[in-house]
Amino acid sequence: MSTNFKQALAKNKIVAAVKHSEDLAEVLPIPWITVVFLLGSDINGLEQAIKLAGNYPGKHVLAHLDLMEGIGKDQAGIRYLKKLGLKGVVSVKWQLLHYARDLGLFTVQRLFLVDSEAIKTGLEIIKKVTPDAIEIMPATVPRFAIEEFRKVTNLTILGGGLLRTEEDVKGALANGLMGVTASRRNLWHLHLP
């Protein structure tokens, strides 16, 4: 899925981040949205969300493990998600991503870069787990922070958080991000190939 993920981002730099599984019905029909992060749901809504996503070939839906309710945050929980048909996961917990990678799921390591120490820790984490992609929070971090990651990896680097306008998105991309995750509906409708 790593190559498919990069190809999907090449079609549009916006990754829709939906807070409720019900929002998938709104975002999946948008033709240029090819990647969706499900940030909030529970075990009851997830199975239906995965089935709905299956109606949209070429769309990639990943669930944020840390924000899912009713799923064990352990190997058994991740095995269950794979059994449901989930293709990928997002987490701040590198150990969970390690399990997910071992099961063949696409993995995105979310990193909060609040200071230089967080950058150093983030660099150590990606060496441990080698995720398929990185999501840096907030997307408005300075260019040098993104460049620190570019020096040591060729992973897809996304940014998320603190994006409200098209100008915010374009500024984040100009700083070196390959794409951005956006929970604001107005940003889902931006087509930025």
What are the functions of these language-model segments?
Residues 1-62, 69-71, 82-85:
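Conserved N-terminal beta1-alpha1 strand-loop-helix module at the mouth
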Residues 45, 70-71, 98, 117, ...:
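Generic structural signal for helix capping and beta-alpha/helix-loop junctions
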Residues 36-40, 95-96, 138-141, 161-193:
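Glycine-rich phosphate-binding active-site loops on the catalytic face of alpha/beta enzymes
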Residues 15-19, 34-43, 62-68, 84-95, ...:
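Catalytic beta/alpha-barrel core
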Residues 47-67, 75-76, 83-84, 99-110, ...:
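Alpha-helix-loop-beta-strand connector modules within alpha/beta enzyme cores
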Residues 30-36, 58, 83-87, 102-108, ...:
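Glycine-enriched alpha-helix->loop->beta-strand junction motifs that scaffold or abut catalytic
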Residues 47-60, 66-84, 126-133, 169-186:
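Ligand-binding grooves and catalytic loops that recognize ribose/phosphate and carbohydrate rings
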Residues 24-29, 73-81, 121-126, 144-159, ...:
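Catalytic cores of alpha/beta
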